């Protein structure tokens, strides 16, 4: 048995039609990037080997994979959704530090006016799937003979809009971001912004925004596919209730801010220690509140995490 791990974004951009699990048609509006294109080519080649050579294969197509649904653990600056979270988190920290310097308030306001922009179309929807759901799908595919020959979207039926991302980031990170046209941002605004920031002696912030444009830019544009789902439940036998995307993104913001400090904590041993402390703190909060940590409003979560965790030393209280 061969398990092919692809991406649900092999369907490319679509204006109206839904991306079906059973069909793979070269899109009229092309792809967000060459990663998606090469994955689509690989899927077509897999289909060919299945038909011609009798390859026993299950094709699993995860959407945009993010962290664990409970803890938000989503390491790495090069991940699609980490890009806006870490970029704006670092931007806010840099601007807060700048405000404490002479004439810093006016300088910070000027930088914020050009830096705190989010390259996304209001109509764009992202299909995020938690890593634990993907792992469940992979393990299930190994014990389901009926999955052979099937293409399975490991995706969600509750997508997140760019407006939701901005709202959650404001609540969790305290950043005020405005939407801007992604194509204009990538080709005109971003080069201008990075030049201004470098001249203003903010090279790290410029680098973070460059990563945002490079990694996330395409996924904020029009025509993002709406994925059909069903084979994950019907064929693989996964639970019908798929992860709550908004909850997962909220926990990702909290994790990136508190556990990894927007990517500044890089030592693997220290990260592993913090992950253990974080998981235990969440378990304590959930036991005391009787609710999922992800369901708590931002202000209540900040209060509760401060009661169980020393955020400076990152040790339990």
Regions from the language model: what does each represent?
Residues 1-37, 51-52, 57-58, 69-71:
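Conserved Rossmann-fold NAD(P)-dependent oxidoreductase catalytic core, especially the SDR/UDP-sugar
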Residues 8-14, 66-71, 135, 158-163, ...:
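Flexible loop/turn segments at secondary-structure boundaries
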Residues 88, 138-142, 169, 251-256:
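Hydrophobic "lid"/C-terminal helical patch
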Residues 120-136, 151-172, 183-191:
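Substrate-binding strand-loop-helix patch
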Residues 50-125, 131-136:
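NAD(P)-dependent short-chain dehydrogenase/reductase
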Residues 162-223, 242-245, 260-273:
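Terminal hydrophobic/aromatic helix or amphipathic segment near a protein terminus
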Residues 223-317:
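Amphipathic terminal alpha-helices
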Residues 38-46, 84:
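Conserved catalytic Lys-bearing alpha helix of Rossmann-like short-chain dehydrogenase/reductases
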